[in-house]
Amino acid sequence: MIRAVIFDMDGTLIDTEKYYRIFWPKALEAYGYTMTDEQALTMRSLGRPFAPRQLKDWYGEEFDYYAVRKKRKELMEEALDRDGIKCKPGAVELLEDLKKRHITTAVATATDLERTEKYLTLTGIRPYFEKLISATMVAEGKPSPDIYLYACGQLGLAPEECMAVEDSPNGVLSAYRAGCKVVMVPDQTQPDGELKKCLYACVPTLAEISHLI
């Protein structure tokens, strides 16, 4: 029986994942590096220590991950301030349905807690969530299972009692490794054959999830 639904945030609840795809390459360009679109997609929801390691593998040990990440955050914040932040289709309807059914909801995101609070508040959906879990709270980010195991612990539930909703491969792997029932709502890319083995379901929008619970 599913007693809670744990959501990824960027690209799942709110339409922000595309900005990571745009602004990782732009931040790298500012420091004299080139990042392909395929590499940018690899970075989605990739937490520490994996993100710094991946970039150093590509660009060398001297690569200043924290400086480039700071630049990416600045560029992304400028774009979000300019364009605004929107919920993904079906988000509010799903959250309202889960609330009526007394199913607990939480967020497990690679984004830091301050920006998580900001984005969810700006989109008007912050009140729906009992817990907000940031990757900064655990030793290893996605695709390690730490963040989902921690989220389940904070909710007082076993992983098998929790459904995880994710849009990216790294997020799916994190939730699957934790033992959650994983539903993917693809944002930037579709799941390949190997990733599909980790999924309970793959649906086009959040609106399709209610009937799975």
Sequence positions of predicted segments:
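Asp-based, Mg2+/Mn2+-dependent phosphohydrolase catalytic module
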Residues: 1-3, 96-99, 112-213
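N-terminal helical cap/lid subdomain that shapes the substrate entry/recognition surface
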Residues: 2-101, 114, 126
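Conserved G/P- and acidic residue-centered "switch" motifs that form tight phosphate/ATP-binding loops
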Residues: 8, 12, 109, 167
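Conserved SAM-binding loop
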Residues: 13, 87, 105, 140, ...
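Hydrophobic residues in well-ordered beta-strands that form the structural core
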Residues: 15, 107-109, 184
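Bulky hydrophobic/aromatic packing residues
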Residues: 17, 104-105, 192, 210
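Residue-level detector of anion-binding/catalytic polar loops
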Residues: 34, 104, 181
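Structural motif
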Residues: 43, 108-110, 165
